[in-house]
Regions:
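Short, polar/charged alpha-helical segment
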Residues: 38-60
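Short helix-initiation/N-cap motifs at beta->coil->alpha
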Residues: 61-72, 159-188
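Beta->alpha turn/N-cap motifs
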Residues: 63-67, 77-78, 82-91, 108, ...
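Ligand-binding "clamshell"
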Residues: 92-104, 118-119, 190-192, 197, ...
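A conserved helix-loop-strand patch within extracytoplasmic ligand-binding domains
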Residues: 104-154, 252
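A bilobed periplasmic-binding-protein/Venus flytrap-type ligand-binding module shared by bacterial periplasmic
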Residues: 111-122, 224-238
């Protein structure tokens, strides 16, 4: 079982006191959506909330500063949906904590990438170079795979890339020093490390720009972020309305205007072809 950290967001702290209130006790036209701070909160505020409000919904966005509390809040009824994670993380977290949560729809996703405040090129790597990376298993695997692709390390042959860990590093080719940190702390680590892997949401929330990255992953479907809901809510009308909002032309326009460089889900790529 994961330990539940305190929420830093004042709004989230206040809202967490109502975790015992089941979602079905609320007006079904009042939706509470949890997100990580940064672009996924902005996607809801700028794109999804206006669409749903035109349909008569009241939408409240609760921002979290960690990857743990949003799923507990969703399972316990404090949230109706959340948007911050990919399917690998959702599946593992739900299994480990016996939560009945399901994917609703993929969302535009910012890639994990390598940033540096001390170096302008990856070619400056040398023996003893410090590299910070996420300490959670799924995102650490993404970082290790990219390091393998860059030729800085070598992973064990035939390793499942979504399960790669430090134990699978067979050769530290550049003799770098890996420093696992909580994902939210990685932007700050840039002051003290040579290079840091930073998840897209935390990068943008901290003021980093995607085009400043020295290397970016190519996002696969496994790492495309998603909207999660309680499995029991799958057939409810508001769920269909929420999904339709993400699939809309209006949200595609918001994505193109405000989230350039994000990897678009298949439905947005298909819609883009039809509207051109």
């Amino acid at each position: 079982m994961y330990r539940r950290p305190l929420l830093i967001s004042t709004l989230a702290l206040a809202f967490a006191t109502s975790l015992s209130t089941p979602a079905f006790a609320k007006d079904p036209k009042e939706l509470v959506i949890g997100t990580s701070a940064g672009p996924y909160a902005d996607q809801v505020k700028l794109g999804i909330k206006p669409i749903l409000e035109k349909q008569g919904y009241k939408v409240k966005v609760v921002e979290f500063n960690d990857y743990i509390q949003p799923n507990f809040a969703l399972a316990e009824g404090a949230l109706d949906a959340n948007a911050f994670q990919h399917i690998i993380y959702l599946t593992k977290f739900s299994t480990d904590n016996k939560l009945a949560l399901s994917e609703l729809i993929k969302v535009p996703t910012a890639p994990i990438a390598i940033y540096s405040k001390k170096h302008k090129s990856l070619n400056e790597v040398k023996e003893g170079t410090t590299v910070a990376l996420p300490n959670d298993p799924t995102n650490q695997a993404r970082a290790l795979v990219l390091l393998d692709q860059l030729g800085w390390i070598k992973l064990r042959a035939n390793i499942d890339p979504i399960r790669a860990s430090e134990k699978d590093v067979t050769d530290n080719l550049k003799k770098i020093k890996l420093i696992p940190l909580e994902a939210a702390q990685l932007p700050r680590s840039l002051e003290d490390t040579d290079f840091s892997f930073v998840n897209g949401n935390f990068a943008l929330a901290s003021g980093l720009k995607l085009n400043e990255a020295l290397a970016r992953e190519k996002i696969s479907a496994n790492y495309q972020n998603l909207v999660a809901i309680r499995t029991a809510d799958k057939s409810k009308p508001w769920v269909k309305d929420l999904e339709a909002a993400y699939r809309s032309k209006e949200f595609l326009e918001v994505t193109n205007k405000h989230f350039a460089g994000f990897s678009k889900p298949d439905y947005q790529q298909a819609l883009e072809v039809t509207v051109k």
